[in-house]
């Protein structure tokens, strides 16, 4: 038996006994804050797509998304069929994914879907050279990447991965 097998690890010493629990609680809190922020931001971004002149409706949604698709097609290389299909799914996807994150439903998979959705949005904004929007979405993607690193500390979820 080697001497290293007889030596207790520093984490197992009495002086460090409570530190892993404290660290775990802090990481759980950090993940929860990230999950709630990303979920709320995603949900509200989806709901805002249904707004027009102070009211929310499906008619507003299709008008807004049609205008968005036309604008991106007119300012980029992307065809209207592609931008229109993405735009018509976008608001619903944001609402469903945002709600799933807030509730903690399959959080790891939901975070990946959220990240992919934001990368898709970034692609459209890159195509129309909207650098401020790209930077804004890059921050969101960074937060999602951070949440994916911390997802193993997800203690408050309705349906875990």
Where are these regions (language model features)?
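Extended, low-polarity transmembrane helix blocks
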Residues: 2-67, 73-76, 80-96, 103-161
């Amino acid at each position: 038996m080697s001497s290293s097998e007889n030596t207790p690890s520093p984490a197992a010493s009495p002086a460090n006994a409570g530190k892993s629990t404290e660290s775990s609680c802090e990481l759980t809190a950090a993940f929860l804050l990230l999950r709630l922020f990303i979920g709320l931001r995603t949900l509200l971004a989806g709901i805002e797509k249904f707004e027009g002149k102070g009211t929310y409706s499906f008619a507003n949604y299709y008008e807004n998304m049609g205008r968005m698709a036309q604008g991106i097609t007119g300012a980029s290389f992307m065809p209207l069929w592609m931008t229109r299909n993405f735009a018509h799914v976008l608001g619903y996807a944001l609402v469903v994914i945002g709600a799933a994150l807030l509730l903690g439903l399959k959080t790891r998979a939901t975070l990946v879907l959220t990240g992919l959705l934001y990368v898709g949005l970034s692609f459209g904004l890159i195509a129309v050279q909207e650098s401020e929007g790209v930077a804004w979405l890059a921050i969101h993607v960074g937060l999602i990447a951070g949440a994916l690193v911390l997802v193993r500390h997800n203690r408050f979820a309705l349906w875990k991965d």
